[in-house]
Amino acid sequence: MEYANNMKPVDLDELKQYIVNANGYVKMVYLHWSAGRYHEIYDDYHISVDNDGRIYLPDPDLTIKRNHTWKRNSNSVGIAVCGCLDAQPNSGYNTDFGSYPVTDAQIEAVSMIIALFAKYGGVPVECCLTHCEAAYHDGYGPYSGDEETRWDLWYLPDSGMGGQMRGGGEVLRGKARWYMQQSVA
């Protein structure tokens, strides 16, 4: 993982154009956290979202293969929220997000990005999975006993449910559907 510190933020309109350019190539979107600090952006991911919701890309070409999800890097895009250094899974419902927890601004921005991929990139909302969900499918998710367990975004607080912890993928995909209905994305 290489730290890329000289990236400039892009807005949703710019990102939409990059997504349109990748339409037909990208089949899946995987959602991560960087396991680092806010403002640390790594080039393993196509898109990074900082704590204030700003969006960063190491390159506008979303078809470049990046190493973000084991055995799932081809024809996919990796999106990471910056943060979650020292996070602990506990039982999921009581996740400790560490010293740089996922913010509401990150949850909203990632949800809008998912909506953009669904609307302009030909990637159904259902094809946007957290790294934890992908890890469950591939046998290295929580409780698997695997040394390389991945539980990125296993659970997230759902602001629509008073901050109750729910499956992270459910929260993000649900918000993406809402953004699509509201024509925000």
Q: Which role does the model predict for each range below?
A:
Residues M1-N23, D86, N90-A185:
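Basic/polar, cationic surfaces and motifs that engage anionic cell-wall
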Residues M28, S76-G78, C127-L129:
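Structural preference for beta-strand elements that scaffold enzyme active sites
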Residues S48-D52, N67, S76-V77, F97-P101, ...:
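Short, low-complexity, polar/charged sequence segments that are solvent-exposed and flexible
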